[in-house]
């Protein structure tokens, strides 16, 4: 049976509990997170998208996960927050894409998930003002970050990391997380130290 063709694009935002800069990408997921384990929230603001005949324009979703040790060792606990405006068909499409069940970039991570925590619905609000951004999903997720700049005090472009192999985007902007609050699907994490990692980028995914 042929898989459903799909394509989505928009903006991706993430914070994690690792100190800035997160070591997991340059360490090829073989090194321990800076706090031993890592909790992360990857938020996706879909500007244009479809899953078969199901339109996904304007919706959002957040992938939450806890990795108990080095990411490459697996045994992640992961779940999804879907936009409460999504219909049942749209929610199913978001779940298939975000979990990797529909193929695409997230399929590369699906084998690392030991426990799927399920799907919860909430209003998801994205706010972007220049180098600052925030994502809020009711009382479940509330995170914000600001782009990281280099040593040149006159720089106008933020630091970027390229050729990452990250499923969200191969190239993204590094950011300092100003706050991260996650209380959803059995996961709990709060940080307002300003020392944690953030990153963001445009994203474009499609089925294989």
Summary of predicted features, one role per range:
Residues 2-49:
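N-terminal ordered "arm"
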Residues 13-17, 33-34, 50-55, 106-107, ...:
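N-terminal start-of-chain detector that recognizes signal peptides
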Residues 54-62, 86, 120-126, 175-180:
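Noncatalytic linker/hinge segments flanking ATPase motor cores
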Residues 151-208:
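Extended, charged low-complexity segments
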Residues 32-37, 69-74, 118-136, 173, ...:
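Short, surface-exposed loop and linker segments with low hydrophobicity and enrichment for Pro/Ser/Thr
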Residues 46-52, 75-76, 110-115, 156, ...:
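Short C-terminal domain-edge/linker segments immediately following a structured domain
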Residues 36-107:
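Aromatic- and glycine-enriched beta-alpha-beta binding-site module
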Residues 76-159:
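Charged linear interaction tracts used for macromolecular binding and regulation
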């Amino acid at each position: 049976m042929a898989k459903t063709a799909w394509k989505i694009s928009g903006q991706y935002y993430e914070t994690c509990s690792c100190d800035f800069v997160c070591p997991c990408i340059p360490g090829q997921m073989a090194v321990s997170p800076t706090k031993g384990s890592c909790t992360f929230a990857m938020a996706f603001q879909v500007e244009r998208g479809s899953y078969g005949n199901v339109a996904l324009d304007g919706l959002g979703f957040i992938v939450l996960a806890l990795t108990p040790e080095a990411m490459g060792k697996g045994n992640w606990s992961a779940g999804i927050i879907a936009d409460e405006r999504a219909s049942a068909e749209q929610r199913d499409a978001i779940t298939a894409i975000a979990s990797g069940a529909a193929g695409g970039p997230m399929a590369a991570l699906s084998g690392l998930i030991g426990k799927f925590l399920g799907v919860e619905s909430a209003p998801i609000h994205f706010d972007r003002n220049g180098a600052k951004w925030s994502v809020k999903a009711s009382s479940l997720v509330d995170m914000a970050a600001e782009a990281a700049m280099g040593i040149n005090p006159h720089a106008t472009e933020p630091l970027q990391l390229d050729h990452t192999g990250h499923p969200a985007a191969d190239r993204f902007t590094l950011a300092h997380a100003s706050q991260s609050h996650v209380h959803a699907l059995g996961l709990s994490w709060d940080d307002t130290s300003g020392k944690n990692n953030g990153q963001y980028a445009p994203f474009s995914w499609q089925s294989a």
